[in-house]
Amino acid sequence: EVRLFQVIKTMEELKEWFMGLIHEYVKWARYLYHNAQRRDESLKDLEFPFPYREGQRELAVSVYRTEARRRKLFIQAPTGIGKTLSTVFPSLKAIGEGHGDKLFYLTAKTITRGVAEEAFAILREQGLYFRSVTITAKDKLCFLEKPECNPDACPYAKGHFDRVNDAVYEIVHKEFGITREVILKYAEKFKVCPFEYCLDISSFVDGIICDYNYVFDPDVRLKRYFADGAKGEYIFLIDEAHNLVPRAREMYSAVLIKEDVLAAKRLVKDKSPRLTRQLERVNKIFLEMKR
């Protein structure tokens, strides 16, 4: 059903509305343009922060060439060689040369996300102009004891969209390493949902540090980057990629739990005899498999 509403406006009213709308877009376009300019300028002069260890320079060169040629590279290197900096540094150089728009650093563990944050911080001390955000799971960002994502239950969800643009604009003008703690500080200040805020911030930074799920899991992946029709020139650094195999199995596997089937059966017992019988059949199959 299509419903039409007719609203009559004067030319002056339309002009005022249009100029206000354009002003909002222009300030973001101006930010993105100048941010990319300053980022690329800083990358031209960026030097590796330490003397190269054995094998580090060869690794960095291989990473840069792979990204410039839009290929894939699998790296197996001993612990302690400095793989994080040796892959992040050439990836940033590749972005500076126009071989990518955004860097995704993917990890399986919280501790390795901290290593990536530290690598960016070290390079910023060398003059790097580069903003990054660490995406944290919703339940670890939520201010409530139990996440309830609706305006009636959560004061941060109520009016979120009225305040989030100003919140994003301020944080990307004041911060470079946008970690969980930084997000919580600004989310509290502006009274916005920290998780949704974090996702919106990701659209206006150059690097994203996150779990594998946000790229590979079909249910969790970031739709703004990976939905059908979404396009972008992205560079992916997958830390400890051997962990991706079992994680991918989990992402693409369904799970049925016997206790849940029995709980559902109890709920519908007096309401749907047919569904109750079907659930009982499922329960019997579980019992047969258990034998």
Give the ranges of each region predicted by the language model.
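Accessory nucleic-acid engagement/destabilization modules that flank
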Residues: E1-Y31, N35, G100
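Conserved phosphate/pyrophosphate-binding and hydrolysis machinery centered on Walker-type P-loop NTPases
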Residues: M11, P49-R53, I81
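Conserved pre-motif I regulatory segment
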Residues: L32-I75
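A substrate-engagement module of RecA-like helicase motors
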Residues: Y33-K44, H99-I208, N213-F216
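Walker A/P-loop NTP-binding motif
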Residues: Y64-R65, T84-G98, A119-L123
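Walker A/P-loop
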Residues: R69-P90
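Generic beta-sheet signal
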Residues: R71-I75, D101-L103, G207-C210, Y234-F236
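Signature of the SF2 helicase/ATPase Hel1-core->accessory helical subdomain module
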Residues: T87, G114, E118, F190-G207, ...
